[in-house]
Design a protein with these regions (language model features):
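Active-site-proximal loop/turn and secondary-structure-junction residues that shape catalytic pockets
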Residues: 68-70, 91, 112-114, 133-135, ...
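A charged N-terminal "starter" segment
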Residues: 1-129, 134-152, 188, 192-201, ...
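Solvent-exposed alpha-helices and their adjacent loops that cap or buttress functional pockets
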Residues: 98-101, 122-123, 145-148, 170-172, ...
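Charged (often Lys/Glu-rich) extended helix/loop segments that serve as interaction or gating elements
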Residues: 286-441
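Conserved active-site and cofactor/substrate-binding residues in soluble primary-metabolism enzymes
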Residues: 20, 36-43, 69, 135, ...
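Active-site loop/helix belt of alpha/beta enzymes
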Residues: 160-312, 403, 414
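Short beta-strand segments
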Residues: 65, 152-158, 206-208, 245-247, ...
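Activation segment
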Residues: 26, 254, 333-334
């Protein structure tokens, strides 16, 4: 088990996170329960922030990719750590503004931003909008004129770098729905078009090659391609980008199949990337751009676990043993989407050695409702508390009320003390927005 300094086994043989006993958490708050370690989140913010300060003389900004985990308390933590935020919807923007983020540190993404979302961004002086289509560029130019602004923008570019990860989270393939391709010339054409817009100020480019990537070389290759493109645009249009956003995608540990990247390791990723940017700036005779990076999963992923209570156990002789829990795809759809792998721990018997391989199933009425497949556990019993590790990213943020199940609450742990940061839902919440027409009364 990769503890990453947030998890340990205490004298009772129970799993702890951030100094809090997971069995006690399950008893106090119930299950399913998302648990987040505040210290881990803060530390990862500092790792990235300090690396830019150390290796790039502070000529950049870390943006938390908030789609990984979105709630007011986490946004507040990120803001307090003096990094920026990227948002991909009106709802995420609303949350960032409510959390008090300075508008100039908010970057807005999305391949199909609604007109209402663009207007909302302009009305609230959002610092930079990342443009992903001609229609968006035209709409934003018109809206900027309407609001008397000259909006700063980046253009999302697809550098054509193949990242070795699940194909659903590769975002820089030639056929991706995101960005303008370098290979077919569309990135060049949109640049020429954008610099003629009177009410938009093109600051530079954004790219993002995918998620859960461990190969340093993939990021370096993307940086190389982007710096070469910056030089091309300088030569062709006398436009020299002053901002380069290289996105995020740094991998985290889910199982022992994954690399265990230390905090220093993440800093070394940035050090290598920054060295390449500096070298290419010199080689191509362009200025070193203001650098933006967008870590999300690596800030919150390993900070979180999910606690479940074991219910029914079904052993199909010679085939498979199912251990059913009180959660499932409504609180973690990643297995259904990506066949995601996780590590499971019997939180109330954490010092016991695994004795069997089981599949942890959810309670939804779906055959594909699996939390994690083929995991090693001791012989668990009904009532045991299971912890699924590294669930801080893309679990709560992707949760739903499927089968009219309640989305679990979230508690934040600091120095052994846990507090709600997302309250439990109630059955009343499920029907709060339901409307029954008069004819059906």
């Amino acid at each position: 088990m990769n503890t990453r300094d947030t998890l340990k086994i205490n004298g009772k043989g129970h799993l702890e996170i951030g100094g809090a006993d997971c069995v006690d958490l399950a008893e106090k708050f119930g299950t399913p329960l998302y648990v987040m370690d505040e210290a881990y989140i803060r530390n990862m913010c500092r790792v990235y922030r300090d690396a830019i300060e150390k290796y790039y003389d502070g000529n950049g900004l870390v943006l938390y990719a908030s789609k990984a985990f979105s709630c007011l308390a986490v946004y507040k933590i990120v803001k307090q750590e003096k990094i920026g935020i990227d948002v991909v919807s009106g709802g995420e923007l609303f949350t960032a503004l409510k959390a008090g983020f300075p508008a100039d540190k908010i970057y807005m993404h999305g391949n199909n931003k609604l007109v209402s979302e663009l207007e909302y961004a302009l009305q609230n002086d959002v610092g930079t909008i990342v443009v992903d289509s001609y229609s968006e560029l035209d709409t934003l130019d018109t809206l900027s004129e309407k609001y008397g602004k000259r909006q700063s923008i980046l253009i999302r570019v697809n550098p054509g770098v193949e990242a070795h990860t699940h194909h659903f989270i590769q975002t820089a393939k030639t056929d991706s729905k995101f960005g303008f391709s370098l290979s077919d010339g569309t990135a060049e054409k949109i640049t020429e078009y954008a610099i003629r817009k009177k009410h938009l100020k093109l600051k530079g480019y954004h790219c993002h090659i995918g998620s859960q990537i461990f190969e340093k070389q993939s990021f370096i290759l993307a940086a190389d391609k982007m710096m070469a493109f910056i030089r091309e645009m300088k030569d062709k249009f006398a436009f020299e980008a002053d901002t380069l956003n290289l996105g995020g995608g740094y991998g985290i540990w889910y199982t022992d199949e994954d690399a265990k990247i230390s905090c220093d390791g993440y800093a070394e990723y940035l050090q290598a990337l920054i060295a390449e940017i500096a070298a290419k700036a010199k080689a191509y005779d362009v200025k070193k751009p203001f650098l933006l990076i967008e870590p999300g999963r690596s800030i919150v992923g390993e900070a979180g676990i999910t606690l479940y209570t074991v219910g029914a156990i079904k052993d199909i002789p010679g085939v498979k043993k199912y251990v059913a829990v009180d959660g499932g795809m409504f609180d973690n759809p990643r297995y259904a989407l990506y066949q995601a792998k996780y590590t499971a721990v019997a939180a109330n018997r954490a010092n016991e050695k695994p004795t069997e391989i089981v599949t942890i199933a959810g309670k939804c009425c779906e055959s594909g409702d699996i939390v994690c497949a083929n995991v090693n556990l001791p012989a668990v019993k009904t009532g045991d508390v299971l912890a699924i590790l590294s669930t801080g990213a893309y679990n709560y943020s992707m949760a739903s009320n499927y089968n009219r199940n309640l989305i679990p609450p979230v508690v934040l742990v600091k120095d052994g003390t846990a507090e709600y940061i997302v309250k439990p839902q109630t059955f009343e919440d499920l029907i709060r927005n339901d409307v029954v027409p008069e004819r059906l009364q």
